[in-house]
Amino acid sequence: MKSQKIGSMILLIGILLAIFNFAYSDDDIERFSINPEKPISFTSDQPGFPTSADFPIGSILANSFYSFGGDVNYFQLNISLMEEFSKDGNTGSQATWNQYTSVPVSPISSAVTANRVYTMSIGSLNRVKKGDITSMESTDFLNDEKYSSLVTTLNGGVSYGDDVFFLSSKSATGEAVLIHINDTATGTFGTSSYDEILLDAAINDPSSITVDSKLGLAFIGDSDGDILVFNMTLKAKIAIYSNSSIANLRSSGVVDEERQLLYICGQAGGMNSYITQVDIFHYSATDITLLHSFTILGSLCPSAGIDVKGGQLFFSTTTSSGSQLIGTDTSGGNTGSLSENIANTQSVAISVDSITKTISVFYPDSVFYGTFKSICPSDCSGHGECNYGTCVCDHNYQGQGCEEELCLTLNNCTGTDNGKCENGFCYCSSEWEGAQCEIRRCKDSCNGYGTCNTANYTCVCDSAHMGETCNELVPPPPCTYYTDSESCLSRTTCGWCEVDGLCKEGDRYGPFEGFCRTWFFDTNVETGVIALACIFIAFVGILYIIDIGTTVPIDIKRAKDYAEENKSGQFPKATHEEASVLWWRDQRSHKAWTFMDQFQLISLVSHIGVVFPSRFISFTEYLDWSNLGIPLPPSINPPQIWSVPTDWTSNTARTILSMAQYENSLGSGDLYLLPNILFWFGLLLGVFLVPLLLAYAIISFMESLIHWKEVVTNRLIHVLVRILTFGYIGVLIAASFAMVTPLHDYRIIIPGAIIFVLYGIGLPIAIWFLLAVPEARLHNPTFKQRFGCLYVHYKPKTDHRFVVFMFIKRFIMAVIIGILSFKPMTNYPLTGTDLAVPIVQVVVIDIALIGYAVLLFIRKPYFDHYQLWLEYLLTAINIVTVSLSLTHIKSPSAAGELIACLIQALALVACIAAYVVAWLQMRSSFIKKVKKYLCCCCKSSKSSGEIDLSKK
């Protein structure tokens, strides 16, 4: 019972494997061994095919197929000529088909010896000599009691030398019997010409017989799936194999005599099943052993063939849709099926030619002929033989498909260490050369940068190279090796410190170690940058001189007015022209400060955490506007030294500059940024306020100049408001950065927080409440002189506090730059925090600018419409400039920098143009004289032109 369960499980697994195998092989015919491009089928309705041919049985011997047809005609087919006749489809040549004679009764089985063809029919045994149609002999054993009850097995005839065997069984008991005839026996052919050999009782109803002609063994299968091994020389049994997984008859089999392997079919799952199991046995003269089993699709496996060289099996089976030819390798793999041009009846025999790779399948009324592919890679490329799926290459080839030609004629590349043979050519190693890799050389021939010392085959490199093969550059000497600026600046990582007269490692911002005030990098003189700095300083200087120069007469006039007020008790009322001049002067002054504000925005944009050229920040070696947004000297001497690792191969001609990077460029630690900014802010306050304070102190002791005291007081407050407004962005950025510095040191966080609250938040709030006064107060001369710079350019009744919104815009931009300052590396493209920070900064700044522009459009706060349109233009340009920062995220963008520079140049030109327009609008006697002079010149030129025309 247990063995039956095991057998059933094995059968079930085999069925599933067969279904899976064919589910994939039917659609992939290229995997099948049969070549589908050349299948030819010859049928009885084709020209030349024997009209009476009908092959229910047949035998193959010496490349010929012998068969007796249903009309008892005997035919012989020369298989070797099938290729020639497959070309034109004509099989009618007598060299191919030979009809010899007729037999009295339709045969059931046949066998062929060297001299005769034997057939066995119901009740008779027949033989005929090859080529002699008159030699038919028959014997009738129906009346012979000994043989009358025999049932002959279909296609159960075989031959071994001169012995012929027909497989039969007794009708009553099913016992297996072999009818034996010796072809060389003399005498009359009759009942005495053959004898009966009873087989083992375990074999019932024999169904197939397969012969190994080399060892003289016959493998007899029965209807129960058992196999008897029979020695045809000794006429004796050797062994019996019983397989519990096969419970139905054994059909055809085929043997590989060289390897002593038997491949035999067995019906799996019952007679009506379409699954056939193929068992693989290894046998000897004394034993038989099961090695492996696999399943194929189909039933009634009547014939099989084998390619004994390549290792392919062919089976003819039947399915519900008709007959098919199945090909596999000897393990059951690489399976495929072919049904095209296949007859719908059971096959009689299969002939396989391993040399020509052709296969012939014989059916009762047709012959299938085709070629099959080799299962060896590339059919061994024509340079070897396929041996059971493995190439046995010729002596001068190697590889799985014998595709690689050995270098036997090249002395095999003079050894495995000298080179490698590839397809008949030697590819030498780096230390050998020549057709056979027989010539020694230096490794890689020193890469062309040295000579070979043949004493020990080592490279002697030139002065610029080093290494075993001279493939490495000699590292440059340290920067300190260079003693003049020209040679120093020729190195990409060296800079020249003019003060010390030393060459040091660094970048555009200064040396990596220490500090240098006069630092040159890349070139000694940056002409374009210095020219830009000179233009900026010239413009700022001119505007400052104009502002100061026009202030002195106004202050003198106001001092007289204060003196008059002290005498009469009433401040003198200004004339219409004086009021107009003062109003337009205020508008002109505001446009000058707008010009300065635009420069500050460029500085602020330069602190966004993306790559900008260093010259965009450092005007010259002497000026840097990262301090307060104006060109000031880079820094004071630092209190400590800061250093970074050096890299001979780095080139920092382009450098990231956030506030953190700027702090690094100062040559100090995180504690130094805020004090440095405050130093310049304090210095700026001192430069302007100290002289005024001294003047105030002196005037206080002079009774005759007491009316000047009010003027100086007003000017002190006015200058203080201007400086607080100007320094707002720079100081607030530094304070914001100080609060988030990685040091988390109270010495920098607390001062930063105090400045942030008092200056960053407190100043706009103080201005809001300061300007919350009646309109009459706004026109008061004293109040106006002190705080007029905050509101005189706005509409006094409705928008005089609009300046607070300007401070809110500056507050947002400064804080987002300061708190998001970080120390990124110059790696592209930017990722992670390096990518997020500039995006956030740009988005927030753009939102602040857009919000400010919306307020401008809604309120239209300016009296001067030129100023309003200037603000519109500058806001649009600044939004674009800030957004262009993002063009540097993936890589430094020259186009982004160029566009930013061009539109900022346009913005500065617009500021200057608005300044000139405001000046021309002043209704003063001086301006009138200038206009009158210009008009006279124009009239004179026009008159001269008219005279010239008349003369012509």
UniProtKB/Swiss-Prot annotation:
Gene3D superfamilies listed in its UniProt record: Laminin
Membrane topology listed for this record: Multi-pass membrane protein
Cystine residue pairs: 442-452, 446-459, 461-470
All residue ranges annotated as the EGF-like domain in the record: 438-471
Signal peptide from the UniProt entry: 1-25
Top-level division of the source organism's lineage: Eukaryota
InterPro entries in the record: Dev_Signal_Modulators, EGF-like_dom, EGF_extracell, LE_dom
Cytoplasmic-side segments: 549-591, 700-722, 774-801, 859-868, 919-952
All ranges on the Extracellular side of the membrane: 26-527, 613-678, 744-752, 823-837, 890-897
Intracellular or extracellular location(s): Cell membrane
GO BP annotations listed: actin filament organization; cell morphogenesis; cell-substrate adhesion; mitotic cytokinesis; phagocytosis; protein localization to cell surface; protein stabilization
Alphabetical keyword list: Cell adhesion, Cell membrane, Disulfide bond, EGF-like domain, Glycoprotein, Membrane, Phagocytosis, Signal, Transmembrane, Transmembrane helix
Residues annotated as transmembrane: 528-548, 592-612, 679-699, 723-743, 753-773, 802-822, 838-858, 869-889, 898-918
Pfam families noted in UniProt: EGF_2, EGF_Teneurin
Residues of this chain annotated as glycosylated in UniProt: 78, 182, 231, 243, 412, 456
SUPFAM superfamilies: YWTD domain
GO cellular component, one term: plasma membrane
Function: Involved in substrate adhesion, myosin-independent cytokinesis, organization of actin cytoskeleton, and phagocytosis.
Official protein name in the record: Substrate-adhesion molecule
Organism of derivation: Dictyostelium discoideum (Social amoeba)
Originating gene: sadA
